[in-house]
Amino acid sequence: MTQSNPNEQSVELNRTSLYWGLLLIFVLAVLFSNYFFN
């Protein structure tokens, strides 16, 4: 049960990377929408 801490850290890292990925996709979507509207 001593290896539960590294697992939790890896889960937190995956969540942060997932949030950054969603943010990047959102920014790209906004840029593409601006190109389409222009």
UniProtKB/Swiss-Prot annotation:
Annotated GO biological processes are: photosynthesis
Q: Where in the cell is it found?
A: Plastid, Chloroplast thylakoid membrane
Quaternary form? Answer: PSII is composed of 1 copy each of membrane proteins PsbA, PsbB, PsbC, PsbD, PsbE, PsbF, PsbH, PsbI, PsbJ, PsbK, PsbL, PsbM, PsbT, PsbX, PsbY, PsbZ, Psb30/Ycf12, at least 3 peripheral proteins of the oxygen-evolving complex and a large number of cofactors. It forms dimeric complexes.
Return the similarity comment.
Answer: Belongs to the PsbL family.
The principal location of this protein is: plastid
Species: Arabidopsis thaliana (Mouse-ear cress)
Cite the entry's keywords alphabetically.
Chloroplast, Membrane, Photosynthesis, Photosystem II, Plastid, Reaction center, Thylakoid, Transmembrane, Transmembrane helix
Stated membrane topology is: Single-pass membrane protein
Name the InterPro entries for this protein.
PSII_PsbL, PSII_PsbL_sf
**What's the gene?**
psbL
Q: What protein does this entry describe?
A: Photosystem II reaction center protein L
Q: Which HAMAP family match?
A: PSII_PsbL (MF_01317)
Got a GO cellular component term for this one? photosystem II reaction center
What parts of the sequence cross the membrane? 17-37
- The answer to whether keyword Ubl conjugation applies is no
Cysteines joined through disulfide linkages:
none
Please explain the role this protein plays, according to its UniProt record: One of the components of the core complex of photosystem II (PSII). PSII is a light-driven water:plastoquinone oxidoreductase that uses light energy to abstract electrons from H(2)O, generating O(2) and a proton gradient subsequently used for ATP formation. It consists of a core antenna complex that captures photons, and an electron transfer chain that converts photonic excitation into a charge separation. This subunit is found at the monomer-monomer interface and is required for correct PSII assembly and/or dimerization.
Note the Pfam families from the entry.
PsbL
